[in-house]
UniProtKB/Swiss-Prot annotation:
MF terms (GO), sorted A to Z: structural constituent of cuticle
Localization terms from the record: Cell membrane
Membrane topology of this protein: Single-pass type I membrane protein
Signal peptide: 1-24
Keywords: Cell membrane, Cuticle, Glycoprotein, Membrane, Signal, Transmembrane, Transmembrane helix
Origin superkingdom: Eukaryota
Gene this protein is translated from: cut-6
Protein name, UniProt field: Cuticlin-6
GO annotation, cellular component aspect: alae of collagen and cuticulin-based cuticle extracellular matrix; plasma membrane
Transmembrane parts of this sequence: 542-562
Its biological purpose: Plays a role in alae formation in dauer larvae probably by regulating cuticle assembly.
Source organism (scientific name): Caenorhabditis elegans
Glycosylated residues in this chain: N78
Pfam families the record matches: CUT_C, CUT_N, VWA
Residues annotated as domain ZP: 233-479
């Protein structure tokens, strides 16, 4: 993997580290030799913070093997005043910074500092060690020099490692993790690194040797101690992307359509390392898009981020990255008291496949072509539909469309259906009409747009219900919707008692998902096209042109004839 030369073209879907399939990279040192590594590190500098496990399960002899590995690693790096610097933290119940970056810049001095470290012992709090790395371990780090943290552990941390690891990555620190023995929690290693490529595992501390030091050094150096490929960030409350370039970055990274929002943009002044760039934004800002999924059950979060390489202008080298994270909903375990009975009870469980739901805008009719361009005032149909996966003959689910809004892509939103599924403004959208299956709803509307904003996108929530044993009664169709000014036709008016049941029955729904239309570009008027001439007029024009052409030919022939005759009649 190599740093990208102004090319970050990709579309990524990432899963939160909590649901990553835990697997570790075996050590592959077959093509790595000392000469290759020496050539790689000679002209490259890096700030390395090494975190050694000093918990009670380690012991003094095993801890010394970690110190030997630290010396192997230091000998591979270009340790010098202008080259690489190293800091070291040993951690147990309480982490301790043994020496800081830049404190020992000569290989002999650094080796002496490592040898004098004494084993600490205690509980395993890797999270605290990562926090100490952020608070004190980075002191003395030079601007423009990439930063790497390497964590060695033989088990499971007793505190949280996810949040401090994310904070380190936000500070442009690339984290590597080495798990020793089969008892190590590989899942936590993935949480620390954020990328399985930077996870190494060995079976014993005897394998913390020169070969591993070579493999680790090469893995870091071959991408110049920066991310080799763009990496996305799926935080608990934010989303983003990180990448590296071959040349110093002088442009801006921003959320599409939000260049002028400071929270949604990062420039060179925000990148300590001008070749390691990226942007993270909170879920609540920059029009970050979120929608729920029932299968698998969880939430998708997505945003489009633009890498603009010129400081002022968009150019052909700029790239847009669509970043998507999926946050899976954890299973809920409910404990209930059990009563002992001599009577055997038989339970039968029925599993239903969830329907596939879609929201589209149709031209001219509810089943017309999907609209992506429309004219202001044009009649277009909203269409919500859930299709039974098990076959059209099934009649398992019903649906309620509710909580709809229209968005112009700049964070400006206007509600058009309320939480009960009723229309709010007849000019924008009235209460949808449902067919008898309760899995299809449609409603016509006349195209509108925001002032100076030609693009619209609609989003709604669909709550599903099981029709079995009256499970959709009181949920759908929407109940007791008020007639809106300027609205005609059928309206859903029901007994007030059913209205009171709606909130209670919505909670009984199978699940709620988010659906949204394609973006629609609204034109003020249709482009003027030149009308073809009527057929009789075309025919007349052809006759006229023919007569003129024949006349010209006749005149030309007469002229030639008279000229020729005049010459013959001249006296010799």
């Amino acid at each position: 993997m190599r740093p990208i030369p102004y090319d970050i073209s990709l579309s990524i879907t990432s899963f939160l580290s909590l649901i990553l399939i835990c697997s570790a990279n075996p050590i592959d040192n077959g093509l790595v030799d000392s000469e290759l590594i020496h050539e790689c590190v000679t002209h490259k500098a890096v700030e390395v913070i090494l975190l050694l496990d000093a918990s009670g399960s380690i012991g003094d002899d095993t801890f010394k093997k970690q110190l030997s590995f630290a010396m192997h690693l230091a000998s591979r790096l270009n340790i010098s005043e202008d080259g690489s610097h190293m800091a070291l933290i040993q951690y147990a119940e309480t982490p301790k910074l043994e020496f800081s970056l830049g404190q020992f810049n000569h290989p002999t001095q650094l080796e002496w500092a490592i040898q004098r470290i004494e084993y600490q012992s205690g509980a395993t709090n890797t999270g605290q060690a990562l926090r100490l790395t952020l608070e004190k371990g980075l002191q003395g780090a030079r601007p423009g020099i990439p930063k790497v943290a390497i964590v060695i552990t033989d088990g499971q941390s007793q505190d949280d490692v996810s949040e401090p690891s994310q904070l380190l990555r936000d500070a442009d620190v690339m984290v590597y993790a080495i798990g020793v023995t089969n008892l190590v929690n590989v899942h936590q290693l993935h949480q620390m690194t954020g990328n399985p490529v930077r996870v190494f595992t060995v079976e014993s501390f005897e394998q913390l040797d020169r070969a591993l030091a070579d493999s680790l050094t090469w893995s870091m150096c071959k991408t110049e101690f920066r991310p080799g490929t763009p990496e996305i960030i799926c935080g608990p409350d934010r989303i983003g992307v990180k990448a590296s370039t071959k040349q110093p970055f002088e442009g801006n990274v921003f959320v599409m359509d939000h260049y002028h929002d400071e929270e949604c943009r990062a420039g060179p002044e925000k990148f300590p390392d001008s070749r390691s760039i990226g942007l993270t934004v909170p879920f609540s800002a920059c029009n970050v898009h979120r929608y729920r999924s029932l299968n698998p059950k969880g939430i998708f979060v997505e945003v489009s981020i633009v890498f603009m390489f010129h400081s002022l202008f968009m150019t052909k080298t700029d790239q847009t990255v669509k970043v998507q994270c999926f946050y899976m909903e954890a299973d809920k375990h409910v404990t209930v008291p059990l009563s002992v009975s001599m009577i055997t009870t038989v339970f039968r469980e029925q599993i239903y496949q969830m329907p596939q739901c879609a929201y589209t805008l149709r031209k001219g009719a509810p089943d017309g072509p999907i609209v992506r361009f429309a004219t202001l005032g044009e009649s277009v149909y909203h269409r919500w539909e859930c299709i039974e996966v098990e076959g059209a003959d099934k009649d398992t689910f019903g649906m309620l469309v509710h909580s709809c809004y229209v968005d112009n892509g700049y964070g400006d939103r206007v509600d058009i259906l309320d939480s009960n599924g009723c229309g709010l403004d007849a000019v924008l959208l009235s209460t949808p009409d449902y067919d008898t299956s309760l899995r299809l709803a449609t409603k016509p509307y006349h195209v509108f747009k925001y002032a100076d904003r030609p693009v619209l996108q609609f989003q709604c929530q669909i709550t599903l219900c099981l029709k079995y044993d009256g499970g959709c009664e009181g949920i759908t169709p929407p109940q007791n919707c008020k007639k809106l000014p300027g609205e005609d036709g059928h309206h859903h008016h029901h007994h007030p008692e059913k209205r009171r049941k709606l909130v209670r029955r919505l909670a009984d729904g199978v699940g709620t998902i988010d659906v949204f239309t394609d973006s629609v570009t609204v034109l003020e008027q249709e482009p003027a096209c030149q009308q073809p001439l009527p057929y009789p007029l075309i025919n007349t024009n052809l006759w006229i042109m023919g007569i003129i052409t024949l006349t010209n030919i006749f005149v030309f022939i007469l002229t030639v004839w008279f000229t020729f005759r005049k010459r013959r009649c001249k006296p010799a």
